[in-house]
């Protein structure tokens, strides 16, 4: 019995293997999730947002959290340059966050936030059952807006605690 394959059959097998190999990375990229970039006292919103844009390919979800005084970039009163960068983040697949605690303490007026900005809660107090045991999210949170990676979600909640 001849175990040698015909050139056409070998070529077809090679093409199928190449097609699968090319398809897998694209599918893996669609599942990939970028990091969290925090605009805080020493790191402006524009700098954090540009870092997120530079480190994540278009379409890969990443996250930008703005803490006071950098939250102005997420409002209707944002400067032209801040609004431009903010819009670039959203167009590239970025998610914009503010902390719910900053809304609760009056540092941010939620009526001034542009559509699409998500208010995220920090960790509940120790001993609280606000997040059910074994879960990562509050029961009423829209998990589609939040990071899937545990490390990123923990950083986000820590920054807002």
What are these regions (language model features)?
Residues 72-118:
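Mid-chain, structured segments of secreted extracytoplasmic proteins
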Residues 115-161:
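C-terminal partner/receptor-binding element of secreted or periplasmic proteins
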Residues 29-80, 86-88, 93:
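N-terminal secretory signal peptides
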Residues 38-42, 65-69, 99-102, 122-123, ...:
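Active-site-proximal beta-strand/loop segments in catalytic clefts of secreted hydrolases
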Residues 20, 25-27:
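N-terminal signal peptide c-region/cleavage motif recognized by signal peptidases
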Residues 2-15:
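Bacterial N-terminal signal peptides that target proteins for export
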């Amino acid at each position: 019995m001849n175990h040698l394959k015909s050139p056409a059959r070998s070529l077809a097998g090679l093409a199928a293997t190449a097609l699968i190999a090319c398809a897998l990375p694209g599918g893996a990229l669609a599942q990939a999730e970028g990091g969290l970039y925090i605009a805080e006292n020493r790191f402006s919103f524009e700098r954090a947002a540009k870092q997120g844009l530079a480190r994540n390919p278009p379409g890969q979800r990443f996250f930008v959290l703005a803490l006071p005084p950098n939250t102005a970039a997420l409002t209707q009163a944002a400067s032209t340059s801040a609004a431009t960068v903010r819009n670039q983040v959203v167009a590239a697949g970025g998610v914009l966050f503010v902390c719910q605690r900053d809304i609760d303490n009056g540092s941010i007026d939620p009526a001034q936030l542009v559509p699409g900005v998500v208010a995220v809660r920090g960790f509940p107090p120790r001993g609280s059952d606000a997040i059910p045991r074994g879960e990562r999210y509050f029961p009423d949170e829209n998990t589609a807006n939040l990071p899937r990676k545990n490390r990123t979600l923990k950083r986000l909640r820590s920054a807002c605690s």
